[in-house]
Amino acid sequence: IDVAKHPEYDIWIPELIFGHLRTSTNYKKNEKRIVGGKNGFGFKLVLIWSTYGMIETIDHVRGLKYVQEFNDNLNEICEPKITKCKGTKPYTRVIFKPDYKRFGIEGMTSDLFSMLKKRVYDIAAVTDHSVKKIKITFNDELVNVSNFSQYINMYIGSRGDCKRIHESGDERWEYAVALLSLIHI
């Protein structure tokens, strides 16, 4: 992610990406895509349903680290802290605290924790690791799923445990089908 001001909007690009609704470019419904974006909503919706959020990203080309906090369901967007950094590999990290009251709960439930953890594993399974080594973590623990096949194995076991049809239809889609008597997610 470029740590620079957007030439048209005069807003820092990370803030535009993560903190302002309808800022992506994937609005054409007839266009073939290899991503499943939600028209620029993504993490912004997480921030709207959170009491606190933070983004941290490294722009290794410009040698800048960008940190910005968001509070009160995205009602407060804090000024970013931008510092110089040299020789650091690029990454983006997001942190958030759900607004438990809005969800009608007092704190993190085991169901919510499991759902959030599953979504992180979903992301790890569909992230393209072929271009560069991308590390995905959940609560500072490395997620050891780097492809869709490993993701399937988490739920139904190895090919020896459970027969399946697993194909890559083209560069855009990968899918699997298995017959199970019982699946527990």
Cite the ranges covered by each PLM segment.
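GHKL/Histidine-kinase-like ATPase module
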Residues: 78-79, 114, 118-125, 129-183
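Generic amphipathic alpha-helical segments used as scaffolds and interaction surfaces in large
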Residues: 100, 104-111, 139-142
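Phosphate-interacting basic helix/loop segments used at nucleotide- and nucleic-acid interfaces
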Residues: 31-40, 112-119, 123
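Contiguous hydrophobic segments
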Residues: 42, 183-185
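Short secondary-structure boundary/capping segments
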Residues: 7-10, 70-73, 111, 146-156
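GHKL (Bergerat-fold) ATPase N-terminal catalytic module, capturing the glycine-rich phosphate-binding loop
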Residues: 1-106
